[in-house]
Amino acid sequence: MDLKLLNDQGQAATFSAPDTIFGRDFNEALVHQIVVAFQANARSGNRAQKDRAEVKHSTKKPWRQKGTGRARAGMTSSPLWRGGGRAFPNSPEENFSQKVNKKMYRAGIRSILSQLAREDRVAVVDTFTLESPKTKLAAAKLKSLGLDSVLIITDNVDENVYLATRNLPYVAVVEPRYADPLSLIHYKKVLITKPAIAQLEEMLG
């Protein structure tokens, strides 16, 4: 698969990328599965309701069992009552995780990268470094490359690059092992350094 190789001025040459990573068919069902699993595994239990044993209430019977004409009632903590406990409350310990086999996950990442390459959303650079940790420098460099919303995958995250890009809302910098399916899909472009492509091939090939 031929990808664009950009220089510092944004001029493009051709880079021959490995078909094992960028030449696969798009498997929509698999990509959907790994994205959903990734989002589910990132979830933390932060909802909670009380059941009928946990709500504050009296155990006194609201009215006598027979003779009032009203429906019988045992206590005000019943889920039928306003202010009563939930019948099936959510718990912070709820487990949302989904298991995805490593082989499937790697195949899904390859499928995403291949589709992005076909859509001309992947570009390659030799390296991505900055002289100092200035956001202005990072923004200017990305502008010269013709990039605004971009995921930068580099073999080694330079401290200057990390500090300079962390305040840019549509830019993320990661190493190949941290390139997750959601980020790959989310950003308009993916910029990969040559050494990072070698690492991706070793990880996913």
From Swiss-Prot:
Bias (Basic residues): 58-69
Matching PANTHER family: 50S RIBOSOMAL PROTEIN L4, LARGE RIBOSOMAL SUBUNIT PROTEIN UL4M
A Gene Ontology BP annotation from the UniProt entry: translation
Similarity remark: Belongs to the universal ribosomal protein uL4 family.
Short name of one Pfam family: Ribosomal_L4
Gene3D superfamilies assigned to the protein according to its UniProt record, in alphabetical order: 3.40.1370.10
Protein keywords: Ribonucleoprotein, Ribosomal protein, RNA-binding, rRNA-binding
Region (Disordered): 43-95
Quaternary data: Part of the 50S ribosomal subunit.
Protein name per Swiss-Prot or TrEMBL: Large ribosomal subunit protein uL4
Molecular function GO labels: rRNA binding; structural constituent of ribosome
Keyword ATP-binding among record annotations: no
GO CC term, one of those recorded: ribonucleoprotein complex
Basic and acidic residues compositional bias, start-end: 48-57
Domain of life: Bacteria
